[in-house]
Curated annotation (Swiss-Prot):
Organism: Clostridium botulinum (strain 657 / Type Ba4)
Annotated binding of ATP, by residue: K267
Name of protein: Cysteine--tRNA ligase
Membership in a protein family: Belongs to the class-I aminoacyl-tRNA synthetase family.
Details of cofactor binding: Binds 1 zinc ion per subunit.
A family per Pfam: CysS_C
Length: 465
């Protein structure tokens, strides 16, 4: 298996520190709002990588944190007239709802930064003691010049960074590129007691501390969105390696951005979508397959038209699964014949090809293509004359290859019922808003698929015709 390591800018053989075990840390959300589709891609990508590592037999300890104290949290809490803790509690709950709906497996642990204050203060104290950090008026800064390999992850040159950092620089810092690892308390801000007075941690120290305390001095994989490479991950490396004198993470993985209609997603451009908004209209399988339809290191373009295309492709996959499920009930032949044994062995080549693609830096786009090829083959060669064993083998193989991607696991009957109920809710909403055109379109679209809606005093009922 090969992975692209941002630290070395090349694909490397994946060799974890302990054979058969993987320690993986992914930077999670700042819990002040619902997560958007850009965040969703990061979460889906690394959930898939974790699933695939487990599929290949690794035991994965997967940590994804919650940043529950930082400037954004404080600003939002003040705007809403609530506390930072209450805001964090609320949006952690909302995160779990959306992540569960997106079929993202729960992490081994989701630590909150505020649960690690004692450990963070110890971390900061150790850096001061070792000469890598200094305190001024209750603020503590990390001295980037003291860490000789600063910039090694992002390829940034410290001298060039210093030239670019001289605008609005804090004059108290010894160097413009020094960054805060402990911040003194400001009015109306939550704070904790420390040897430097009341204050709170800087963002970068939080992840370093949680990774150290939950996974140890050196971890196998550290991952996150590409926007975190600098300065967040660069600063994590500096702090962690300055403290321990050991390599912080062996492999660094970064997922690329999501653009919306070929533009960067932003609220000002009115092209900002939360995952929850999309999941109200599309099944999780659709959003996951869309997110995985490009290589994780390549930017993808998001649009409703592209989601519709993904849904149509996914429907074809599920139609084939549905046909196989029906066939399993209908076929009479039992026991694999000689030619079926041979054909079953031929189907194994798809599994081998799938593993080959995923072993090459988790190439989900090509892996999905392999699943389509498998289904085309099965559609052509498995019929009512096939044996139950062969039909079941093909069905199980399709689901097996879909599993690491988090797709194709639903019973088609359950999936259909779920979609119909979702469309009924959408139609009810349209009627409430007097959008009769949309309400009629949903009804007519369902009728074309053989689903008739009946409006009754007890609510909307549906039946297949």
């Amino acid at each position: 298996m090969k992975v692209y390591n941002t630290l070395t800018n090349k694909k490397e053989e994946f060799l974890p520190l302990v054979p058969g075990e993987v320690k993986m840390y992914v930077c999670g959300p700042t819990v002040y709002n619902f997560f958007h589709i850009g965040n969703a891609r990061t979460f889906v990508v690394f959930d898939t990588i974790r699933r695939y590592l487990e599929y290949r037999g690794y035991k994965v300890k997967f940590i994804q944190n919650f940043t529950d104290i930082d400037d954004k949290m404080i600003k939002k809490a003040n705007e809403e007239g609530t506390t930072v803790k209450e805001l964090g509690d609320r949006f952690i709950k909302e995160y779990y709802k959306d992540a569960d709906d997106l079929n993202i497996e729960r992490a081994t642990k989701n630590p909150r930064a505020t649960e690690f204050m004692k450990e963070i203060i110890k971390f900061v104290s150790d850096l001061i003691e070792k000469g890598y950090a200094y305190e001024i008026d209750g603020d503590v800064y990390f001295s980037t010049k003291k860490f000789n390999s600063y910039g090694k992850l992002s390829g940034q040159n410290l001298e060039e960074l210093q030239l670019g950092a001289r605008i609005n620089v804090d004059e108290r810092k010894k160097d413009p590129m020094d960054f805060a690892i402990w911040k003194s308390q400001k009015p109306e801000e939550p704070a904790w007691e420390s040897p430097w007075g009341m204050g709170r941690p800087g963002w970068h120290i939080e992840c370093s501390c949680m990774a150290y305390n939950l996974l140890g001095e050196t971890i196998d994989i550290h991952a996150g969105g590409s926007d975190l490479s600098f300065p967040h991950h660069e600063n994590e490396i500096a702090q962690s390696e300055a403290r321990t004198g050991k390599q912080f993470a062996k492999y660094w993985l970064h997922s690329a951005f999501v653009n919306v209609n070929n533009q960067k997603m932003s609220k000002s451009l009115n092209n900002f979508f939360t995952a929850r908004e999309i999941l109200e209209k599309y099944d999780a399988d659709v959003l996951r397959m869309f997110m995985l339809s490009g290589h994780y290191r390549t930017q993808i373009n998001f649009s409703m038209e592209l989601l519709d295309s993904t849904k149509a492709a996914l429907d074809r996959l599920y139609n084939s699964i549905n046909n196989l499920e029906n066939l399993l009930d209908e076929v009479k032949n039992e026991g694999l014949r000689d030619e079926e044994l041979k054909y079953r062995d031929e189907l194994q080549k798809y599994k081998e090809k799938y593993i080959e693609k995923m072993d090459d830096d988790f190439n989900t786009a090509d892996a999905i293509s392999v699943i389509f090829d498998l289904i085309r083959d099965v559609n052509t060669n498995i019929t009512i004359e096939s044996s139950k064993e062969l039909v079941k083998y093909a069905l199980d193989l399709i689901r097996e290859l879909g599993s690491p991607l988090g797709i194709l696991q639903k019973s088609t009957k359950a999936s259909l019922e779920e979609e119909i109920e979702r469309l009924i809710q959408e139609r009810q909403k349209a009627r409430k808003e007097k959008d009769w055109a949309l309400a009629d379109k949903i009804r007519d679209d369902l009728k074309e698929r053989g689903i008739v809606l009946e409006d009754t005093p007890q609510g909307v009922r549906w039946k297949q015709i």
